[in-house]
Amino acid sequence: TLFTSFAEKMGYAKLLKIVKTYRNSQEVIDIAGNFIQKNSKQITKRLISPKKINDPVVIYTYDSTYKGKNGNRKSGSNYAIAYAVQTAIEQLLEYKKNENISPGTILLLGRFGFDGDRLERTGLFEYSHRGSKIRCVKYPNLDITYMTAHSSKGLGYDDVIIINGKNETYGFPSKVEDDPVLAFVIKGDRSIDYAEERRLFYVAMTRTKNRVFMIAPE
């Protein structure tokens, strides 16, 4: 890209790296950093943070074959995901209780806008407008927002729950192919599988000020 090869394309350039961060804990940025730096085309940079935290990333799994009461696998899987999200919220609250701090703000992150709609259809969450507040029926007083990973860029929340970590076309990473027309205006990064999805997952992980909870199939 122009940014990673700026000096080569434009002549003299001096690279100044911002390496200190105060949003994320060192543990979170180490995990996210190791993940994104597997791409050899990335500019190498290791961030440093004064914040420390135990259990920076917590993974919750669900049964993707669950069919629910009506025997429908799709709606059953949606319910299993929503229930796993609710369980993650309960664990988050337990962490806060043990640390003697308030729950703060919670961000639910999906890969697509309809991930939030699917949560609502289960009856465990209420969600009326995309990119806005989402209500956990069991814990109605919590400050929870739903967004896509793309729309969350630049924002920060106390804790983040990534809800769509499944190996499917509309999962995270997404396997949806770009429109071929885009190839004429955007040079795709083929240096590593799912290069753009890796960058987007890094964005998702680093929206948190504390912990990241990930929801994925067993």
Task: Annotate each predicted stretch with a short phrase.
Residues 18, 31-32, 85-89, 201:
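Structural preference for long, well-ordered alpha-helical segments in enzyme cores
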Residues 10-15, 54-57, 142-144, 155-159, ...:
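Short glycine-/polar-rich loops that comprise or flank the Walker A/P-loop
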Residues 102-105, 150-206, 210-217:
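Conserved helicase C-terminal RecA-like lobe
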Residues 64-155:
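Conserved helicase/translocase motor-coupling segment
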Residues 24-25, 77, 81, 115, ...:
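Helical mechanochemical/support elements of P-loop NTPase systems and associated helical scaffolds
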Residues 1-66:
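Conserved RecA-like helicase ATPase core segment
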Residues 7-10, 52, 99, 139, ...:
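Conserved catalytic network of the ASCE P-loop NTPase/AAA+ motor domain
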Residues 1, 21-26, 64-66, 113-115, ...:
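Conserved nucleotide-binding/hydrolysis micro-motifs of P-loop NTPases
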